[in-house]
Amino acid sequence: LASHIPLEKIETIYLDYHSRSSVMLTRVLAKKFWKINVKWTDATEGFESRIKENEAAVIIGDKALVAEKNFPYVYDLAEEWIKHTGLPFVFAAWVTNRNLGETFKNEFNSALKYGITHIDDMVKNTNFSYLPSHISAKDYLTRNIDYLLDDNKTKGLNLFLKLAGEIN
């Protein structure tokens, strides 16, 4: 969440259209933990450059890395979640409601393991020139993203789903 002012002074929050999980996390944080009541506005292309003094915006992905330098107040949503709950936040996961069979699970887990253990190769062979110069692609992919869904992350996910259900 990026803003020119502190949380308690924000009147409007623009919601990035690229991530429903980040949008809902922001709504949960605002209602349950930050205790702020704001106007929610769906963002449109280029919204990051139109944020006024009493506004904030959920900015995700690579755009968030750039936004860090343009706003005096930047709240990392995952860090805010951890600060208030003590649990990690799960932004995305592979899920299904049908049985895919052991063959698929084994192949998927093998591909995931291969990807995780070959991040160095991927970084060498991919153009990350769009990242700000102070961001290392390898660091971003190995420190900012955790690829395994463990019990603690499942607890965090379940708490998030419960709280999201309460505010909807």
Regions inferred by a protein language model and the residue ranges of each:
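Short aromatic/hydrophobic contact patches that present stacked aromatics
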Residues: Y14, A93, D146
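Pocket-lining segment of extracytoplasmic ligand-binding domains
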Residues: D42-T126
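Short, basic/aromatic-enriched C-terminal tail that caps enzymatic domains
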Residues: A92, I167-N168
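Bilobed "Venus flytrap"/periplasmic-binding protein-like clamshell domains
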Residues: L1-R50, N54-E55, K155
